[in-house]
Amino acid sequence: MKKLFGTDGVRGVANVYPMTAEMAMQIGRAAAYIFKNGKKRHRIVIGKDTRLSGYMLESALMAGICSMGVDVLLVGPLPTPGIANITSSMRADAGVVISASHNPFEDNGIKFFSRDGFKLPDETELLMEELIFSKRIDSLRPTAKEVGKAYRIDDAQGRFVVFLKSTFPKDLDLSGLKIVLDCANGAAYKVAPAVFEELGAEVISIGVKPNGTNINADCGSLHPEVMSRAVKENGADLGIALDGDADRVIFVDEYGNVVDGDRIMAICATEMLRQGTLKQNTLVATVMSNMGLDIAMKRAGGQVVKTAVGDRYVVEEMLKGGYNLGGEQSGHMIFLDHNTTGDGVLSALQVLAIMQRHQKRLSELALVMDPLPQVLVNVRLAEKSDIMQVPEIAKMINDVEERLKGEGRVLIRYSGTEPLLRIMLEGSDEGDIRCWANDIASIVEQKLGGEARG
């Protein structure tokens, strides 16, 4: 069982174990040893978002990697998918992302991409942990003559802008569109506005003044109400909101209504079905996706394959099954024909291409899917336990499932990145399922302690 790595790398409060400079250096050393293969000069890319603690962790990782005889390529603030792309295009041995994605600025994280731009398998992360905790890495240092160097790649953002524009159809542009763009004061604050403006859109940018502590603060994909308000105030055609590392995206239509990842997947998948480009007529989603997505895909002649929650599991299923489109309700979307991981700006470009191709507004395209009412309640718990072993909780869940009569579902799972138990209900009546979700949350609080929040 892994001690450091969760579903999306190592994550925690900055300057508190495990997100300390000391641990970052050890992680860098272990990674460098693993990716060092053969006699050639090895290189690892390091990129980050805009958190204040990114400077500390970047320096520590760089020192650890160089101490093992591997060179470092520093790209500075860059979206997570940009780091995956640069790692692959520069033929580096690996890429490192310093980010806690949508979490508040106090948190930070470290995750890796392999040389081909995909997230690491569990086996590699376990090997990294074994090297760190066994102290074996201490005996593997190279000589002073063999230590690595660090180089800064000054044009990384420009390279990624060029790549992103290359995924947009050559016969289309964005002229005539007014877009509100919320970059969450995060990693895409320069890249995203440049992409949409260079393709011809009028862009109203918010969340583009990072100061190290305002990433995701009342902005970005977790706060679409900010973008929604700006769309209505400015008479924009749509709004696009990214999270702190720009690997996910949420939209609002011209009326300010939120269009989530499920509806965006439905729009893109059904268009790809019409074009004959959706491999095996299959979309990969997670168990959190609304049942309305399954219905929309079936109606269009396709199908949905479900995975555990986490974009890494979506990608694993896509690679295993030979599929080329997958994603999550939260707005992670993977277009494997273009990139190897979730990419908010790239996903937005695919939606904009459909709008421009068919001259339809986002509100019209969103009608492809009719979601079932869905309610999510989070309970913050001190530790994870098997809730079905608590008789009162198990009885409450079983009672709710009986009331749904097969016309909805109950899904309860622990977050992979936060100390939260997520209680999700779907059904035909939103009032009923909200009441039942709160009932389950209340009994969990009573029996296990904790604090519920909607």
From Swiss-Prot:
Cofactor: Mg(2+)
Protein name: Phosphoglucosamine mutase
Designated gene of the protein: glmM
Functional description taken from the UniProt entry: Catalyzes the conversion of glucosamine-6-phosphate to glucosamine-1-phosphate.
EC number per UniProt: 5.4.2.10
Broad EC category: isomerase
Gene Ontology biological process terms, A to Z: carbohydrate metabolic process; peptidoglycan biosynthetic process; UDP-N-acetylglucosamine biosynthetic process
Coiled-coil regions listed: none
Record carries keyword Metal-binding: yes
GO molecular function: magnesium ion binding; phosphoglucosamine mutase activity; phosphomannomutase activity
PANTHER family tied to this protein: PHOSPHOGLUCOMUTASE (ALPHA-D-GLUCOSE-1,6-BISPHOSPHATE-DEPENDENT) (PTHR42946:SF1), PHOSPHOHEXOSE MUTASE (PTHR42946)
Annotated family: Belongs to the phosphohexose mutase family.
Active-site residue list: S101
